[in-house]
Amino acid sequence: LRMSRGLGDVYKRQMAHKGASVCEILQNCVIFNNGTHDSVAKKEDRAKNAIYLKHGEPMLFGENNEYGLMQEGFGLKVVKLGENGITEKDILIHDAHCMDNTLQLKLALMEGPDFPIALGVIRDVEAPTYDDAVHEQIEEVSAKKKYHNFEELLMTNDTWEVK
């Protein structure tokens, strides 16, 4: 699979992201699943079967960006611009920073033939990391402790003798 459009940006965003990040690579395997990603790998099919998501931009795809994603009830639907009065203003704007991951999960789970495969950065939220939370908890507990080191403990009356 020789499709690297936007992959460099994805890697850069992953490296800059604080915390965990996941990058799914669509890799062809000629032994076990040859051609499984042809719908997005072949140049002639890629434009209609893949959507390149960029934060803050409308979710458009197709050879000339003639298709887009709209919300329909609790789901998504593919629409063609110009049909039924649909304009670019009706198309969803990608928000990778939204804390509510409902739409982002729907984008990640899209697959053909009814939907394009979402490529690019789907979700990029700032949240406390586990590591930061552990350090913060240690600092809070340490601040409340009566003794901060072993010497302070030994210099108190809270000691005992083993005989």
PLM regions with names:
Residues 12-14, 38-39:
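Short low-complexity, flexible loop/linker segments enriched in glycine and/or proline
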Residues 1-11:
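Single conserved hydrophobic/aromatic residue that forms the stacking wall/gate
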Residues 19-24:
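A conserved active-site cap/scaffold subdomain adjacent to cofactor or substrate pockets
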Residues 27-163:
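Flexible, low-complexity linker and terminal segments
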